[in-house]
Design a protein with these regions (language model features):
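Hydrophobic anchor at the start of a short beta-strand
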Residues: 6-8, 95-96, 177
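Short loop/edge segments at beta-strand edges and connector loops
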Residues: 12, 65, 100-101, 149-151, ...
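Glycine-rich beta-alpha-beta "Rossmann" dinucleotide-binding loop(s) and their flanking helix/strand
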Residues: 187-196
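Helical element adjacent to the flavin cofactor pocket in flavoenzyme catalytic cores
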Residues: 119-176, 180, 184-187
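Dinucleotide-binding Rossmann-like beta1-alpha1 core, especially the glycine-rich loop
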Residues: 27-107, 116
Length: 196
């Protein structure tokens, strides 16, 4: 958002970025095979995967494209694996493959010898969540985003031209709100939506 002609501020309940959900994630950059085809999640997952390598170079955070394996341990589970493959193809995931037992064991010898097959997604990778989040925040700050730390949102009210956000440190007005509250996203959602 900081690259657009708009004024952005981040209200962060913690003392710094990367103190909540961001620090506790798995660090995996998913290929995009698991999201429902046609969904926003599917589109953004695949697009984010495509962008991450150049972002890591531009913002100087570590990224490794190691690929991922989804293991199938018996023939009975194979249709579920095939469903993930089909979803991935429909979502536009490149280079996706289903590997047989021998191919899996050749690629990853420490996998259980009971493996039947695996979905291999070479475009998956890993990042350091701390470095990445801090790099994004530093870039946003450089582009004019203001950060307000130790500022927990307590209430959000609709106004004629946007929203009034009440925090423990005062009130803010906004034309729009991006809910990036991690595990507390439901609380922010419930402040503005009739659907709980």
């Amino acid at each position: 958002l900081s690259r657009y002609q708009c004024k952005v501020c981040v209200l962060e309940r913690e003392e710094d970025v990367c103190c909540g959900t961001s620090k506790a994630n798995s660090a995996i950059i998913h290929a995009g095979y698991d999201a429902e085809p046609g969904s926003w999640k599917a589109r953004l997952n695949v697009r984010g995967n495509e962008m991450i390598e150049s972002l890591s170079r531009e913002l100087d955070f570590p990224f490794r494209r190691d690929g991922s394996l989804v293991l199938c341990l018996d023939e009975k589970a194979y249709p579920d694996l095939k469903k993930l493959y089909d979803r991935g193809i429909e979502n536009g995931v490149e280079e996706l493959q289903i590997l047989n037992r021998d191919e899996v064991l050749s690629m990853e010898p420490n996998v259980s010898d009971k493996v039947y097959a695996a979905l291999y997604a070479p475009t998956a990778g890993i990042v350091c969540p701390f470095h990445m989040t801090i790099a994004f925040a530093e870039n946003a700050y450089t582009n004019g985003v203001s950060f307000h730390f130790n500022t927990e949102v307590q209430q959000i009210e609709r106004e004629a031209k946007g929203w009034k956000i009440t925090t423990g440190k005062g009130e803010y007005n906004a034309k729009c709100i991006v809910n990036a509250a991690g595990v507390y996203a439901d609380k922010i959602h419930n402040m503005v939506s009739e659907k709980k």
